[in-house]
Design a protein with these regions (language model features):
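Alpha-helical interface subdomain recognition
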Residues: 1-97
Length: 97
């Protein structure tokens, strides 16, 4: 979990540095959003597994965080949209009209 957390933090930090320098490509934002939300969901799932049955109770905040992340995945732009944007970057073919 710590590895994924630190990778996500470094990616967010680097995107912030690029933005401050005026060098941020909007497609890089798709990389950050897609990666960091996916990793956060994976961390929540791992935490839920570690806690066993307690992971689904209100005694621990794991399910609340997982539910919040599911909504973030939706309002930040679905992972499919970010995947299409990144596919265009890699192939040069427009996937969105």
């Amino acid at each position: 979990m710590m590895l994924e957390l630190q990778k996500a933090q470094l990616l967010a930090w680097r995107l912030g540095v690029l933005k401050d320098a005026g060098e941020l490509d909007p497609r890089q934002i798709s990389v950050g959003k897609l990666n960091n939300v996916r990793e956060a969901l994976d961390v929540c799932r791992e935490a839920r597994t570690i806690l066993g049955a307690n992971g689904i109770t209100s005694e621990y905040p794991v399910m609340r965080h997982a539910n919040n992340l599911e909504s973030v995945l939706t309002y930040e732009g679905t992972s499919e949209i970010h995947t299409l944007i990144l596919g265009e970057v890699l192939t040069g073919e427009r996937a969105l009209a």
